[in-house]
Each structure stands twice: as C-alpha cells, then as structure tokens.
A protein has these predicted regions:
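Intrinsically disordered, compositionally biased low-complexity regions
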Residues: 1-98
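Generic structural signal for residues positioned in beta-strands
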Residues: 9, 119-121, 179
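Generic alpha-helical structural element
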Residues: 9-13, 129, 169
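Extracytoplasmic/secreted envelope proteins and their assembly/folding machinery
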Residues: 21, 138-141, 177
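Intrinsically disordered, low-complexity regions
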Residues: 30, 41, 58, 85-87, ...
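Active-site or metal-binding loop neighborhoods of secreted/extracellular toxin and effector enzymes
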Residues: 134, 149-194
Length: 194
C-alpha cells in the first residue's frame, strides 16, 4: 500500500480521535486501522478488506486525489459558520460540510484538478444519543464514505461541494449520501413499507 496515497484525516481531540479509531476497529472485521497522532492521518495496520463497507473505506483511504477530513466534536455545532454568519449546526450525528478544489495551475478546469479537500463533521455526543452502540462504526464509515463520494463527484464535475461563501451544494450532498455506505437507523426510528 502506498503510504502517500492514504488521504483520510481525523481532526479533533486525542480522546475523540482514539474513540473513532477504536469504534472503526471494532466495526471492521478484516482490517485494523491506526492513525498518525501528529497529523491525524489514518492508515491500515493490517488485514485486507473483504466486506463492502471495508472496501469502500479502503477505496477512500487509497485515493490520493480526494483528501477526506473528518472533524470530530462533541456538540452539534460544527464550529463552522453559515454565509450569514450564524453557527452551522447539524441535525443528527454527522454532517456533510462540502469540499473545495485545488488546482495545478491558474486555469480552473477539470484536467488541472490537483486535489479535492472534503470536510465532514461527526458529533460523538449526538452519535451516542441517537444511535445504538452496535451501529457507531457503520455511522462513522458512512460519514467518511459520504465525504469521499462528495469529493469524487466534485472531481468529476469540477464543481466544489461548498462555494466561496460557504454554501454547501445540496445536489452534491444528495448524490454523495446515496453513494456512501448505508447509514444506520437512529434509535426509535421505524420504517414501514406499504
């Protein structure tokens, strides 16, 4: 595995980063992950992906063109601002905060895309409140892969997931959410098919 190709970063307190890595290691059966304590960069310590969720995670990890940044906090306030200056809050435990595109030259065309930098937010406290413990790994993997697929969509379309005013592109979010690994149902949610 090319260590320079690993492009998932976790950002937050050491306690929250350790929590996320521990949850993912409990969730994944065939791979073990670790992280660089200085940079927050995730890596595979051992194993080979064998499930769809593991494969989706490894694909996100090994795509050097998409840099996934999972910001981990405790509240539903992301620490980001809306274009009107108000705090950007999430409704659940995770939130798509879009992405930006960096280019190899001043010409901002698809062929000159150097990297897409994504941002996803995870609230540990909301995750604990809204989801069963057995679903925490599934939720975290969903948030990572949603952010990754948002980056892929932006790379393919040359349209950032967040504009210069901080407005999140809802079309990119919807497509990324649909392409990501499945999200678990919150506690108490019931869905009936008629």
């Amino acid at each position: 595995m090319d260590p320079d190709g690993e492009e998932i970063y976790i950002i937050g307190s050491d306690e929250n980063k350790n929590t996320v890595v521990s949850i993912l290691n409990n969730y994944f059966e065939n791979i073990t992950i670790g992280y660089n304590r200085k940079t927050g960069k995730l890596d595979i310590i051992s194993g080979t992906a064998q499930t769809e969720d593991e494969t989706a995670f490894v694909n996100a990890l090994n795509n050097a063109k998409i840099e996934v940044n999972l910001e981990i906090g405790n509240s539903q306030n992301t620490g980001h601002k809306k274009s009107n200056g108000e705090d950007l809050m999430i409704e659940g435990a995770g939130g798509f905060l879009g992405n930006t595109i960096s280019y190899k030259s001043k010409e901002h065309v698809k062929e000159n895309i150097a990297k897409v930098h994504t941002v996803q937010y995870l609230s540990i406290d909301a995750m604990v409140s809204f989801y069963n413990e057995k679903d925490w790994g599934k939720l975290i993997n969903h948030e990572i892969t949603e952010s990754f697929f948002g980056g892929i969509i932006s790379s393919d379309s040359n349209v950032p997931g967040r504009d210069e005013n901080g407005v999140i592109n809802s079309d990119i979010y919807k497509k990324a959410h649909a392409a990501a690994t499945p999200q678990p149902y919150p506690i108490g949610a019931s869905f009936f098919h008629h």
